[in-house]
Structure formats: structure tokens, C-alpha cells
Amino acid sequence: MQFRTKARAVDLLGKGQIADLPTAITELWKNGYDAYADNLNAALFKEGFEELKKSYFILSDDGKGMSSTDILDKWLVLGTDSKSRAEMDIESEETLWKRPRIKAGEKGIGRLSVAYLGNPMLMLTKRIGYPLQALYFDWRLLENYNLFLDDINIPLKSVANLASLESVFNDLKKDFLSNFDKEFDLDDKPIWEGKQIELKDEIINNTREALLETSILKNIFSIFNTRDSHGTLFLTFNPIEQILELSEKDEERIDDKEFILSSLFGFTNDFKDHKKDIQVSLKVFDDDNQNYELLNSAGSFFNANDYNFADVIIDGNFDGNGNFMGNLQIFDEVVDYSFSSIRSKNKNNYY
């Protein structure tokens, strides 16, 4: 006997575990950070920008990217433990020759956060010296409680050159639609029934309507334009309303927008006065053919200079076992301060 997994389990592990939009974006940015990206970008392309027929959302990084083997052995494997073994990377091609980073993700399911952004989705990813990989999927397929994971086909193809991307994209859509060829299970029961028939029709129609419009292709080409290009890009064809509202100036929605932006501000540590390891960006390309930055143009949420206005400052360092050594400043008085962790000292607890 063996366990069998319903497709719904992936939906519950992914979108079901994401509280809000900032969490979804942050989880994907964490994966970009772990992939040694320098730049983590998000961009909303509004309907009407350069004659776009629809709105799109793109989330990208310039990390090490993935080969087809990486996708099959890691990205499509849930709960991978490579980040939770407490093993530091070695400076090499795997780190893009950068200083090893402490991993931000650890559960192996952060990639499923992309389901929260909208549907359907096209993932493009490339490692240095490897061909571009394209994966197409609509996460709503996982909402069918009659499907098992091994019933589902997730199409993946290599892109020999950017000129063939549209052709490959059409092949991916065709392969994805084969998920609906089978109408009955082994017990001769309908796979799609009741209210889910409406969901099925919506998924099929959204896939048939999905296009790579000129402005979107230009953005993709700017990222993957050479053999040595590297990184990962998620293109969402029907972004959720929360994403679309990022471009709104309606006073009634300003609180929701401010919550999203303030949450994303916290992804980087602006209390450090030296150069950041990474840069984050959230741009809007609106229907007036204008583009503007939401995160960096809004002013720093906090910065290192704000320390000067604090009444209490704790300044020091933690070692890999959770012990702290430094000093505590209360108004003008500075005292030495240390803390010894009671955590057991083993390699799984070392950071």
C-alpha cells in the first residue's frame, strides 16, 4: 500500500498557506535571494500601456536560474531539503561567484506562492550556458478534488532561441489543455462535475486567450538576451485585483496599498549603512504610457540615520549558536551586554 496525494494538497500547501500579497511576493523574492540574485523586480503592466489588450504582472530575478534538470529534480519536487540542512554553499558557479548567503527559504514550498498572484502563469528560467526553459501552468487546476497529482501534466519545454518563444508558448498551451482530454476516472466517474465545470471552462478559455504581446516580449528579451543570461521570470496573465489596485489613486483603497508597500519595504535591511546585497523594485507601467517606481520613489521606510533618534539601541552580533555579544545604549549611557542561548548546539541549529 502507498499514500496517494490529491492535487488539492498542493493548492493547500501553496496558495492556502499565503496570508496576503506581500507574503506571496516576499516568498518568491526569498527564492531569488537564495539563488544569488542582485536584483529582485516586480512590474505591473496595465491594460492600455503601449496598446496592451490586457494587464500583466511580472516578477523576476537575476539569480542563477534553473536548467531542465533543476526544474524536474528540485522545482517540481515539494519539500526539498537542500535549504534546511544548515550547509553553507561554497563560492563557485553555483553562487555566481558571490560570497555564500544564509538561506532565506527553508520549507521547500515557497515557489507555490506564485499561485496567489493570478492565473495562468508562464515561468521562464535560464542558467548560464544552458538553454532557456519555459513552463506553463494554471494553478486552479489543482482545485479539482477529483484529481490526483499523477493525473496532472505540467508542460515544460526548452527554448532554443528567443525568436521561437511564441511558437514554444503555443505548444505549451496545447500540452496543458491535454489535461482536460480525459473526462472520466478509472471508476467511470466524471472528473469535472457540478460547479467545477464552470471552473474548467474558465481555465480553458483563459489559456486560449493568453498571448505574449509585444511589450511583454520586449521585457522578456531584455532579461534573456544572451547565452550567458541567467535568472527566473514569472509572468501572470490575469493578476489578482490587489495587484491591479497598486496603480490606483483612489483614496478609499490607499490603506490597502500602503500596507502592501510597507510590507515589501521590510524585505531589505535599510538599517545597514553599507551597500545592500540586493536591490528590490516594484514598477507600474500605466495606460498613459508612463512608468513609475512604487518602492524606491516612495522614500525609505527606515534607514541607518534613524538610529540617531532612538532612546534605546542594542548593537552587537549573534554567533551561529544564537549567542549575543555587544552593548546596550539607553539614552546616553552605554553598557556591555551579552546573552547565552540555551539551544542545543548541533549542526542543524547552527546558522
Language model regions located:
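Intrinsic-disorder-associated interaction segments
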Residues: 2, 158, 165, 250-257, ...
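Generic detection of intrinsically disordered/low-complexity segments and helix-coil linkers/edges
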Residues: 23, 69, 133, 174, ...
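Generic structural motif
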Residues: 47, 128, 140-145, 159, ...
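GHKL/Bergerat-fold ATPase module in large chromosome/replication-associated machines
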Residues: 278-351
